[in-house]
Amino acid sequence: MVLQHTDSTVPQAAAQAAGTVIAFGQASDMAAYGPMPRVSSIIDDCALYYIARTKAVMDGTWNSTSTWDGIGAGMVGIGEISNAVPADVKASAEALRNSLADGSYHAFTGPLNKQDGSAWLAAGETASDYGDDSLAGMN
């Protein structure tokens, strides 16, 4: 399995050439560069954000702010899940994606521990985006 965190087609093409290496793309839909065996791609789409921020500059309403959008806002997406994934697994993945998007599931829900094994989130507790011990400050 090749899962890269670079917006490059090379890992997809290399997996395609190897023939038996499954790939998962990053930043844009990589299907054309390694159609099979491929699972999907994370797709970053900041277009609506950039349009809104540009309009705010133009109409004088711009202010500095942190942005932490994801699947629900459309800033991050999951591309088409290929036939390399069994239908039942694909359906489960799509249901999970949809629950992340509508907020009914939070990916960081306890119990979760930190890398050193110490407790981070208690059972049922969800991580906050900002503040002490938040997702934005995770390292």
Which residue stretches match the model-derived regions?
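A residue-level marker of the well-folded mature domains of exported/periplasmic proteins
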Residues: M1-N139
